[in-house]
Amino acid sequence: MTEQVQANEAETLAAGADERIIRETGIDAKVASIIEPVINTLGFRLVRVRLSGLNGQTLQIMAERPDGTMTVDDCELVSRTVAPVLDVEDPISGKYHLEISSPGIDRPLVRKSDFADWAGHIAKVETSVVHEGRKKFRGRIVLGDAESVVIESDQISYGSEPVVRIPFDLISDARLVLTDDLIRDALRKDKALREGRIPGDDLGSEEAGEQSDETASGEAEDKE
């Protein structure tokens, strides 16, 4: 990423463009409030923060470039930058393991643009309150409008509406479901971005079998 491109992306993010509609609570929210401005300054977008009890305590930070990519070098840059900030702010009690990663193929959907980018693919969506008689939905993402998304169920059950419109402000959690179609599309988009081509171009069947290791791992550190 060149300095000029990074500066442009940071400016866009700082302006609040395409903010997350799904946010953390509790200690995760506290960590997110500390690191999100730092990550934005680097030209990346925060996807999710989650503190788990895995291996003692693990602080997982998912981030990405505005184009959806995230390399190993990107993960290392974010790690080196946010680690000292967390040391100073000290939002977490005790020792923890810091893990920086890309969102992955079956990624969380946290922005309105995420639903648009992955329209046509299957997602699981949970709402904060009962909506249309339930709180959990699964189905194909159909583009809605600025305030909602339409989900077309891929597993029709008795008494459930096959097509549901869900307001964005009711969504508490959402993520893509791993399918063969999703894997092919994700790899095609990644390939297109790396080659400077437009996602959706016919890139050939061989490209669907390729996956870069760069977006599969990140840097992790132990912090006191």
Swiss-Prot record:
A GO-annotated cellular component: cytosol
Top-level taxon of origin: Bacteria
Composition-biased stretches (Acidic residues): 203-213
Record's subcellular location: Cytoplasm
Region (Disordered): 194-224
One GO term of the biological process aspect: translation
Disulfide cysteine pairs (residue numbers): none
Pfam families: DUF150_C, RimP_N
Gene3D superfamilies per the UniProt record, alphabetical: RimP-like superfamily, N-terminal
Record's signal peptide: none
Keywords noted in UniProt: Cytoplasm, Ribosome biogenesis
InterPro entries in alphabetical order: Ribosome_maturation_RimP, RimP_C, RimP_C_sf, RimP_N, RimP_N_sf
Function: Required for maturation of 30S ribosomal subunits.
The family this protein is said to belong to: Belongs to the RimP family.
Annotated protein name in UniProt: Ribosome maturation factor RimP
Originating organism: Brucella anthropi (strain ATCC 49188 / DSM 6882 / CCUG 24695 / JCM 21032 / LMG 3331 / NBRC 15819 / NCTC 12168 / Alc 37) (Ochrobactrum anthropi)
